[in-house]
Amino acid sequence: MAEKITIARPYANAVFELAQAQKNYDQWSRVLNVFADLARDSEMQILIDDPRYTSEQLIGLFVEIGGDTVTESAKNFIKILADNRRLSVLPEVAALFEQLRAEIEGTLEVEIISAKPLAEEQLNEIASALKRRLGREVTFSRKTDESLLGGVIIRAGDLVIDGSAIGKLNQLAASLLH
């Protein structure tokens, strides 16, 4: 959804600059993830999209549900989003914030999807190769998807490496059709 990302980018940049100035990336990561989870909730989405709910009511909900994680700066941030009817972009703001944070910290979150769970040795080899190629430390999230048949799919930011058996079969089928 390019439109939401476009809308979210200036907010993410502003929060990131504030987090840099305050030197509290962890606090902002926590609060943005709480807010993003709230904005993803189907019942909360109905309230966010309902024009009958005022920005003050929505701010109150986010602050109350956010609890102790909500600082005064975070409350002001939610107020800006609510006043501009932009609470629905919170998941994108959180994701962009984490990308900016990873960039500044020299890390990259990598998603590895494999047909079967990978051994530590295999993960270390993948990590080493990605570190050489991308020049950054990598952290993993792992998923298994038996429909891949074999191999792995690696997602690192905008980079997608499809080394799955099903991916190779799809490439072969596409080349035979053309």
Swiss-Prot record:
InterPro entries: ATP_synth_OSCP/delta_N_sf (IPR026015), ATPase_OSCP/d_CS (IPR020781), ATPase_OSCP/dsu (IPR000711). It is a peripheral membrane protein. It is found in: Cell inner membrane. It comes from the Bacteria. Keywords: ATP synthesis, Cell inner membrane, Cell membrane, CF(1), Hydrogen ion transport, Ion transport, Membrane, Transport. GO terms for cellular component: plasma membrane; proton-transporting ATP synthase complex. One of its GO terms (molecular function) is proton-transporting ATP synthase activity, rotational mechanism. Pfam families: OSCP. Belongs to the ATPase delta chain family. F(1)F(0) ATP synthase produces ATP from ADP in the presence of a proton or sodium gradient. F-type ATPases consist of two structural domains, F(1) containing the extramembraneous catalytic core and F(0) containing the membrane proton channel, linked together by a central stalk and a peripheral stalk. During catalysis, ATP synthesis in the catalytic domain of F(1) is coupled via a rotary mechanism of the central stalk subunits to proton translocation. NCBIfam families: ATP_synt_delta, PRK05758.2-2. F-type ATPases have 2 components, F(1) - the catalytic core - and F(0) - the membrane proton channel. F(1) has five subunits: alpha(3), beta(3), gamma(1), delta(1), epsilon(1). F(0) has three main subunits: a(1), b(2) and c(10-14). The alpha and beta chains form an alternating ring which encloses part of the gamma chain. F(1) is attached to F(0) by a central stalk formed by the gamma and epsilon chains, while a peripheral stalk is formed by the delta and b chains. This is ATP synthase subunit delta. It comes from Nitrosococcus oceani (strain ATCC 19707 / BCRC 17464 / JCM 30415 / NCIMB 11848 / C-107).
